[in-house]
Amino acid sequence: MGVRNFIDRVFTVISDLILKLLPASKQEKQAFAYYKAGMAAQAEGDYAEALENYYESLYLDEDQYDRSYTLYNIGLIYAKNENYPRALEYYHQAVSLNSNLPQALNNIAAIYHRQGLLALEMASQDYDAEMEISEEYEYIELAKGLFDKAAEYWYQALKLAPDNYPRARNWLRITGRAKSLDSF
């Protein structure tokens, strides 16, 4: 049995015990069952099934904290499928419900960073007769803005989890966007 499979089984056993021991309404238990089914499907790579279960969980779950993790997991699926606008939408929703989600903040930053790199790539592509200097400048400005957004979200993630995301910390230092990283 692999480590991941063992962890999944332990999670299932512990979550079943918690549901039995803690008072929860039928609706809360059903929402959690959908969440667990979504996690299982996501682990298996069945993203359509995972999304279906996560959406059911969102419909039933009223707890903001629980909903934030469901939204985060939905964002993970969209990011995995390279639908970055949708991933950002769900990560932002997750953070709006739970501001203590450094992993969501990190993922938001990573998407903005990736988009910034793509904008720079567009700016540096070989000139074709159609592209004007003003367009190249626009791509560079777009990249700068996206990198600034990435920096802000990485800064927030590192503030919550100072020992995580060493590559982000290094990028912030190298690009001069570190603010006061050493204070945490």
From Swiss-Prot:
Keyword terms of this UniProt record: Chloroplast, Membrane, Photosynthesis, Plastid, Repeat, Thylakoid, TPR repeat
Listed InterPro entries: PSI_Ycf3_assembly, TPR-like_helical_dom_sf, TPR_rpt
GO biological process annotation, one example: photosynthesis
Transmembrane segments: none
S-S bonds: none
Main location: plastid
TPR repeats: 31-64, 68-101, 131-164
Job description of the protein: Essential for the assembly of the photosystem I (PSI) complex. May act as a chaperone-like factor to guide the assembly of the PSI subunits.
NCBIfam families attached to this UniProt entry: PRK02603.1 (NF002725)
Entry protein name: Photosystem I assembly protein Ycf3
Species, as recorded: Thalassiosira pseudonana
Gene designation per UniProt: ycf3
